[in-house]
């Protein structure tokens, strides 16, 4: 009887990379690692640029040298496609869809979950999926589907800090951890202010694209997140810079 297929879900964050490193270290079966890249538009990744560079220039080559097959998935739809689409029913019918809702993200649904679901439909019955959930994330571990989803981090008693250290030792810790403790698209409405400040300071071209989208008329919502327009955040950072300049001049 053939063994089931084993795949690893990989965002190239510390937990999913540590899972793959543990699989290789302990001889756990692993047929391929699967990564879904959300795109801002047809040419620009939704990954924070430092993380995308790490994925393609460091992590994927390193894993391939270890013999890990990498599958990269992408949706035909992009963030800009969804943003500029039109509402088709209800009181806002005909308006530009605009920013995704926090907690009900159409980008997550259409650009990430659906490509993964299409991939999973072609997997053989009984496929086992390694999920990067650490030993100290008990609530998330309890939600794993028994037999079909496995945490190697829990199996080998690895906490999130252990995962960090394993990746760091292997030279596979993403540079995004220098300014955030979470993964996510650079246009995510759940992004914290330090993440947005990093985008503002280091990637003004991407920041400008978001301001261009904010300026589109006839949107179903003006809010980037639960409380602010993207232009409000832009004003906030400009004011911070102005105050800092005054302090330096004093």
Task: List each model region and its residues.
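Nucleotide-activated chemistry modules centered on ATP-dependent adenylation/adenylyltransferase
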Residues: 1-250
């Amino acid at each position: 009887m053939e063994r089931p297929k084993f795949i690893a879900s990989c965002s190239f964050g510390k937990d999913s990379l540590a899972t793959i490193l543990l699989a290789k270290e302990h001889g756990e079966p692993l047929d391929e690692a699967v990564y879904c890249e959300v795109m801002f538009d047809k040419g620009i990744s939704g990954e924070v640029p430092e993380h995308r560079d790490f994925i393609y220039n460091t992590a994927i080559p390193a894993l391939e040298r270890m013999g890990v097959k990498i599958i990269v998935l992408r949706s035909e739809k992009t963030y800009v496609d969804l943003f500029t689409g039109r509402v088709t029913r209800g009181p806002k019918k005909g308006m530009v869809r605009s920013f995704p809702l926090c907690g009900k993200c159409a980008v997550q649904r259409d650009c990430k979950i659906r490509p993964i679901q299409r991939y999973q439909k072609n997997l053989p019955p009984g496929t086992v999926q390694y999920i990067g959930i650490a030993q100290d994330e008990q609530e998330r571990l309890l939600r794993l589907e028994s037999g079909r989803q496995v945490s190697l981090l829990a199996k080998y008693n690895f906490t999130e800090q252990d995962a960090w250290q394993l990746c760091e030792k292997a030279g596979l810790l993403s540079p995004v951890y220098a300014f955030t403790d979470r993964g996510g698209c650079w246009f995510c409405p759940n992004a914290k202010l330090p993440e947005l400040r990093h985008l503002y300071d280091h990637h003004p071209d991407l920041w400008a694209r978001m301001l261009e989208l904010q300026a589109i008329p006839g949107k179903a919502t003006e809010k980037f997140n639960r409380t602010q327009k993207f232009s409000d955040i832009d004003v906030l950072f400009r004011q911070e810079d102005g105050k800092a300049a005054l302090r330096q001049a004093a």
